[in-house]
């Protein structure tokens, strides 16, 4: 299983599937089509049934039931795209057998080193087979590891028909990294009662709480006049924008928050005297606090509009997704089964909130409750990303164990 996982993962990682937030197509990039078509062929090759790819690049397939029990249909999902923030072109994975616990030279020419001094969690991986970058790209373990693990688990079950299971659906989705993963996902066609995304981080992660999320876009209009004759005439939109930012609580930012704490995050600030644009994301686990954060932004905008003129400030707030806990709590047994599966395999479950979102955040509100399982990677979205092949094996084993438990608990 380990060698199969390594080979699958490296094959997927070499396809550039960065998503593009500025694209209006689905998938947003051609590389995702390339990977999707590859996955369709591989699903057929291992013996999966009902293998489909739709006009938006969503890949689905079925592992038919081999039991007479009335087992709920469960699904497993992973996303094909990688993050747009760091290049995913020409990914060249490096394989390190039996990691010795020391520095890993990713790129000798550029002096790029993956060191336990900077990333102390490396100490947990001594003796593991690691897959790293060559220091010039991201790796794409988020979430090509999840794809490889689902594929390998399905292949294992097909090769071991003595393991009884209900009907299982799998899906590989585009554009998760730009928040559009489920936008065109056909929940009815997928036909699962519950699902799991395999999109988490280190060994044991099990997540069913996500942020409530919104984005805010502020446009401020100024008045540009020659600075030599500007007294009483110029209105500098940059300074108004700075005033807006300064009225938000400075300590409620990503760099100062953790756990269940929410934040405001200024993503971009682009401006001139004449016009300035601010782009924020707003995050909070608590729905009331989430609404209060949005209200705070509206209050600041209204105050500045009163001070500088109503026509000078526009604020647009759009909700992006909500905390999936609200939809998963009524079917909490799906979390409990994942917890039991990990425990059965000697893995300590680490139940914690996702300081972010997954496809499951949106799917849960589309009628498909979907908690998140670990995929095994570390340091996602950058040159220091790596993954343990040993923990990829455990992720695939957890998928198999969850499927077995659903069958065993059915009548």
Swiss-Prot record:
Binding site for Zn(2+) 2: 142, 177, 381
Keyword Transmembrane helix: no
Residues reported in the UniProt entry to bind Zn(2+) 1: 79, 142, 199
Annotated active site: 81, 176
Enzyme class, UniProt record, top EC level: hydrolase
Organism: Geobacillus kaustophilus (strain HTA426)
Function: Cleaves the N-terminal amino acid of tripeptides.
Superkingdom in the source lineage: Bacteria
Family, similarity comment: Belongs to the peptidase M20B family.
Any single biological process term in GO: peptide catabolic process
Record-linked Gene3D superfamilies: 3.30.70.360, Zn peptidases (3.40.630.10)
One GO CC annotation: cytosol
Co-factor remark: Binds 2 Zn(2+) ions per subunit.
Protein name, per record: Peptidase T
Gene Ontology terms for molecular function: metallopeptidase activity; tripeptide aminopeptidase activity; zinc ion binding
Cofactor(s) the record lists: Zn(2+)
Subcellular location: Cytoplasm
InterPro entries (UniProt xref): ArgE/DapE_CS (IPR001261), Bact_exopeptidase_dim_dom (IPR036264), Peptidase_M20 (IPR002933), Peptidase_M20_dimer (IPR011650), Peptidase_M20B (IPR010161)
Annotated keywords: Aminopeptidase, Cytoplasm, Hydrolase, Metal-binding, Metalloprotease, Protease, Zinc
Catalytic reactions of this protein: Release of the N-terminal residue from a tripeptide
UniProt cross-references to PROSITE patterns, sorted A to Z: ARGE_DAPE_CPG2_1, ARGE_DAPE_CPG2_2
Keyword Cell wall biogenesis/degradation: no
Main location: cytoplasm
């Amino acid at each position: 299983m380990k060698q199969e996982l390594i080979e699958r993962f490296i094959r997927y990682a070499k396809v550039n599937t960065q998503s593009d937030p500025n694209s209006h197509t689905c998938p947003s990039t051609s590389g995702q089509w390339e990977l999707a078509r590859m996955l369709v062929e591989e699903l057929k090759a291992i013996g999966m049934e009902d293998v489909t790819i739709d006009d938006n690049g969503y890949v689905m397939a079925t592992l038919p039931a081999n039991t007479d029990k009335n087992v709920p249909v469960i699904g497993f999902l992973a996303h094909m795209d990688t993050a747009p923030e760091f290049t995913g072109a020409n990914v060249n994975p490096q394989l390190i057998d039996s990691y010795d616990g020391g520095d890993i030279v990713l790129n000798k020419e550029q002096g790029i080193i993956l060191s336990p001094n900077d990333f102390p969690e490396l100490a947990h991986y001594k003796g593991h087979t690691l897959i790293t970058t060559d220091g010039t790209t991201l790796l794409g373990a988020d979430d090509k590891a999840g794809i490889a693990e689902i594929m390998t688990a399905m292949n294992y079950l097909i090769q071991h028909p003595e393991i009884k299971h209900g009907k299982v659906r799998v899906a590989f989705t585009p554009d998760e990294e730009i928040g559009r993963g489920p936008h065109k996902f056909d929940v009815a066609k997928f036909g699962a009662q519950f699902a799991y995304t395999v999109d988490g981080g280190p060994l044991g992660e099990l997540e069913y709480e996500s942020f409530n999320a919104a984005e805010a876009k502020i446009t401020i209009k100024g008045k540009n006049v020659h600075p030599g004759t500007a007294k009483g005439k110029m209105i500098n939109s940059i300074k108004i924008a700075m005033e807006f930012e300064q009225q938000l609580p400075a300590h409620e930012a990503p760099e100062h928050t953790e756990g269940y704490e929410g934040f405001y995050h200024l993503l971009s600030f682009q401006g001139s005297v004449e016009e300035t644009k601010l782009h924020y994301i707003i995050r909070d686990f608590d729905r009331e606090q989430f609404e209060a954060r949005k209200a705070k932004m509206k209050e600041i905008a209204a105050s500045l509009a009163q001070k500088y003129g109503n026509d000078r400030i526009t604020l647009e707030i759009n909700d992006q997704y909500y905390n999936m806990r609200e939809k998963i709590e009524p079917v909490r047994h799906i979390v409990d089964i994942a917890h039991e599966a990990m425990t059965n395999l000697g893995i300590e479950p680490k139940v914690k909130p996702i300081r972010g979102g997954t496809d499951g955040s949106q799917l849960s509100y589309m009628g498909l409750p979907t908690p998140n399982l670990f995929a095994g990677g570390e340091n996602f979205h950058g040159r220091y990303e790596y993954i343990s092949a040993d923990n990829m094996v455990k992720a695939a084993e957890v998928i198999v164990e969850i499927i077995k438990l659903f069958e065993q608990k059915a009548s």
